[in-house]
Amino acid sequence: MTSIAFWNAFTVNPFPAAARRSPPPLTPFTSGALSPARKPRILEISHPRTLPSFRVQAIAEDEWESEKKALKGVVGSVALAEDETTGADLVVSDLKKKLIDQLFGTDRGLKATSETRAEVNELITQLEAKNPNPAPTEALSLLNGRWILAYTSFAGLFPLLGAESLQQLLKVDEISQTIDSEGFTVQNSVRFVGPFSSTSVTTNAKFEVRSPKRVQIKFEEGIIGTPQLTDSIVIPDKFEFFGQNIDLSPFKGVISSLQDTASSVAKTISSQPPIKFPISNSNAQSWLLTTYLDDELRISRADGGSVFVLIKEGSPLLT
């Protein structure tokens, strides 16, 4: 908008009355200096004052409106992304809960019916499609730690889990896998418990990262843990046997001696070192594909397509 000149206050003297009655005759303009009597006053003009530019303000307001719209768009996009993330988390959490519910009572898959296996496989497939870490070997810190086997379709474990002759003496209490991402080691362990003892069989292996999802495992040695015998055997003073009351109080001294002997033997055996043996046959290598991984659940597939569902030690999913 063009600036408007503001004229400062100035004085104009009126002509005398006689002059107004008889104005002087007009004469042609001639070059040269004007006479002092007719020389016009030079009007003093102050510096022009620029009025506010409404156009600039309007443009600024338009830009601010555009910025506000852009900010609203960003906020809306963030809110939408947060809603989508929250929704995805809820879906994954619901799928994990359903999976754990399906695994209940299956004895790590040994007692699962064909219908249950189908439902478990469907839930596993859905979780794999929503894997929050599609490149698990690039998130080795999540792989770190001790993982408890909750389910497997690996038929090679079923004879171990279901052998009736073995269950009369020992029962498989826990199968676990411990991963050390800094040392690139894997330790697989099976713990057995019996009436008066417990023991474990462990394999130690090294692993190499072969792809974002796959690791190659090479087993190096096996370890048979020394049986941990119960160091105290409690024999009651009285008990009922086929309807007849048996009183052992007269033999209390003998029983105490037996308990002390059992405790001594248990401590002696338990203090012995474990038995180690090398693993060097052609079956000492395998690969493992991690298809789902978060901070409490891992799903892996091995040679032949066998699936393993493992839960991180300390996770609420174990309770």
Swiss-Prot record:
Q: What is this protein called?
A: Chromoplast-specific carotenoid-associated protein C1, chromoplastic
Signal found in the keyword field: no
User: Can the keyword Transit peptide be found in this entry's annotation?
Assistant: yes
User: Signal peptide position in this chain?
Assistant: none
Subcellular localization, per the record? Plastid, Chromoplast
Q: In which tissues does this protein get expressed?
A: Expressed in flower buds and floral lip tissues. Not detected in roots and leaves. Specifically expressed in conical papillate cells of adaxial epidermis of lip tissues.
Organelle targeting sequence: 1-55
Give GO cellular component annotations, separated by semicolons.
Answer: chromoplast
For this protein, the record's InterPro entries field holds: PAP, PAP/fibrillin_dom
Principal cellular location given in the protein's record = plastid
Pfam families per the UniProt record, alphabetical: PAP_fibrillin (PF04755)
Instruction: Supply the source organism for this entry.
Output: Oncidium hybrid cultivar
What functional role does this protein have? May be involved in carotenoid sequestration within chromoplasts.
Q: Which family does it belong to?
A: Belongs to the PAP/fibrillin family.
Record's keyword terms, sorted? Chromoplast, Plastid, Transit peptide
